[in-house]
Amino acid sequence: MSTADRTAPVTVTVTGAAGQIAYGLLFRIASGAMLGPHTPIRLRLLEIPAAVASLEGVAMELEDGAFPLLDAIDISDDPWTGFAGANVALLVGARPRTAGMERADLLAANGPIFTDQGQAINAVAADDVKVLVVGNPANTNAFIAMSNAPDVPAERFTAMTRLDHNRAIAQLAKKTGAPATEIHRIAVWGNHSATQYPDLTHATVAGRPARELVDEQWLREDFIPTVQQRGTAIIQARGASSAASAASAAIDHIHDWVLGTPAGEWTSMAVPSDGSYGVPDGLISSFPVTCADGAYRIVEGLEVDAFSRERIDASVAELTAEREAVVELGFAKG
């Protein structure tokens, strides 16, 4: 492709850009895995001041990759600079949970971060910005950012449950012996937390209903808790949280949002509710969605049985409590 044939670069901002998830993410973005093989990228890397020196090293490695699609790399510790002109914003950085910290403490610690980032996105990001929050608690951090960006359409703010979706696919593939490519229409509902509900009700394996291939005991006592607790299991096994798999899921999320889901397929994204399936309006909750033309739509009309209803309601209750907590703390409006 000649220089004259190249499209204008897409500006991609990544926060927490010196961290482990970003390290697994940035090189794949630069390679074209996220936005396709013909889309040039301008990377804006955002970090806290103490991590900028480390980030310089990451930028050097990106340069050394000589990626044909990587037009430019900018480094900043200022959100108002880092989000300038952003078409895609991946909010990876967040205050991690430390020993003795309750979930309420985590919400209080992350509130100012996502308030500032939401305000910066509102002021300086591109008109077509798409936001994915990866940093936990992702759903509620996304709600805070969205609440502080009143001029950006609410549907542009999403949180990542694609990692949970991919984990669910992997567990079903392992159980049935089918390749992941033969598994379709899994759904993840609710919060990206241990209350999430990975749902096989409508899933298929090589065209057969998944529920015909697995027993109820495995579903309830193995599959669901394994997916819910997978992050904890990885921490216990490797002594660090999921990084490469989280990065891969972020790539998948943006790729499908921008370029579309395959015909007849859906994925899982945490998006502002429109009231579907009894989830309160505006709550950022995971749903099965389809994507086309740069937009997502919640899959409509799915049957929700009593077991699923109970699981969805439990996760939504947790999200509602988190929303009430950040409203009370002054980070968002109810």
From Swiss-Prot:
CDD domains xref list: MDH_chloroplast-like
HAMAP family registered for this protein in UniProt: Malate_dehydrog_2 (MF_01517)
Residues annotated as binding NAD(+): 16-22, 110, 117, 134-136
GO biological process assignments: malate metabolic process; tricarboxylic acid cycle
Positions with a binding annotation for substrate: 97, 103, 136, 167
Organism: Nocardia farcinica (strain IFM 10152)
Active site feature: 192 (proton acceptor)
Keywords, comma-separated and alphabetical: NAD, Oxidoreductase, Tricarboxylic acid cycle
Enzyme Commission number(s) of this protein: 1.1.1.37
Function of the protein: Catalyzes the reversible oxidation of malate to oxaloacetate.
Catalytic reaction(s) noted: (S)-malate + NAD(+) = oxaloacetate + NADH + H(+)
Protein name, UniProt field: Malate dehydrogenase
